[in-house]
Design a protein with these regions (language model features):
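Conserved PLP-binding catalytic core of the aspartate aminotransferase-like
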Residues: 145-169
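Short, well-ordered, mixed-charge alpha-helical segments that flank or form enzyme active sites
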Residues: 1-3, 28-32, 37, 51-54, ...
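General structural feature for long, well-ordered alpha-helical segments within catalytic domains
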Residues: 2-5, 31, 39, 105-108, ...
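General beta-strand structural signal in soluble alpha/beta enzymes
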Residues: 20-24, 43-46, 53
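Active-site C-terminal subdomain of aminotransferase-like
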Residues: 48-137, 141
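Conserved active-site segment immediately N-terminal to the catalytic lysine
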Residues: 36-48, 58
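Catalytic PLP-binding core of fold-type I/II PLP enzymes
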Residues: 3-35
Length: 169
């Protein structure tokens, strides 16, 4: 549960000529995620965490640079189902039927995003932080410590040390 400094990591990755992939399965909807400002090439999430939607979808985004690499790869993707270049053709003139979309999940995500919009992003972020602080205070009261350093704890992923006395129960 450590909050990573993505802007600094992004700069180092791009300075080295590489591309940046970011996992926001837990974070999306719980803290600010600035895909374009942080120069993220590929990012993915899950709907079942801070988006408060049933599991089953993985929102993704690719930068133009990442899409260029995807569309011009030299080797064939071994899994037809995971071939992003075929998925990208849904929006082009060479549309290829890839699979039946999970319409019920898409509507579920739409409704979850509507609820976040109604609450307001800043209020949503503040709610997750309040809940984190309340949990942290309760855990501290019974002697449980966080694994991430103070100031680097991700509010929605609370990784803690298991007390030695209960490790073998």
């Amino acid at each position: 549960g450590a909050w990573q400094q993505i802007p600094e990591i992004s700069k180092a990755v791009h300075d080295a000529g590489a591309m940046l992939l970011v996992d926001t399965v837990t974070a999306l909807g719980g803290i600010p995620v600035e895909v374009d400002a942080w120069n993220i090439d590929a990012i993915y999430s899950g709907t079942q965490k801070c988006l408060s939607c049933p599991p089953g979808l993985s929102p993704t985004s690719f930068s133009p640079r990442a899409m260029d690499v995807i569309m011009n790869r030299k080797t064939k993707v071994q899994s037809w189902y995971l071939d992003v270049s075929m998925l990208a053709n849904y929006w082009g003139q060479n549309r290829v039927y890839h699979h039946t979309g999970p319409i019920n999940m898409t509507w579920g995500l739409y409704e979850a995003l509507c609820l976040i919009h109604e609450e307001g992003l800043e209020n949503c972020f503040a709610r997750h932080l309040r809940n984190h602080r309340a949990l942290k205070a309760g855990l501290a009261a019974i002697g449980i410590k966080y694994s991430a350093q103070e100031g680097h704890q991700l509010p929605m992923l609370n990784a803690v040390y298991v007390p030695f006395a209960v490790q073998n129960l």
